[in-house]
């Protein structure tokens, strides 16, 4: 799905 990078801090999670 389309996930905002700012929500996760990255593409797959906070890196």
UniProtKB/Swiss-Prot annotation:
The keyword Transmembrane helix does not apply. The lineage of its organism: Bacteria, Pseudomonadati, Pseudomonadota, Gammaproteobacteria, Enterobacterales. It comes from Morganella morganii. Binds 2 nickel ions per subunit. GO terms for cellular component: cytoplasm. Its main location: cytoplasm. Belongs to the metallo-dependent hydrolases superfamily. Urease alpha subunit family. This is Urease subunit alpha. GO terms for biological process: urea catabolic process.
């Amino acid at each position: 799905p389309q996930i905002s990078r700012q929500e996760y801090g990255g593409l797959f999670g906070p890196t």
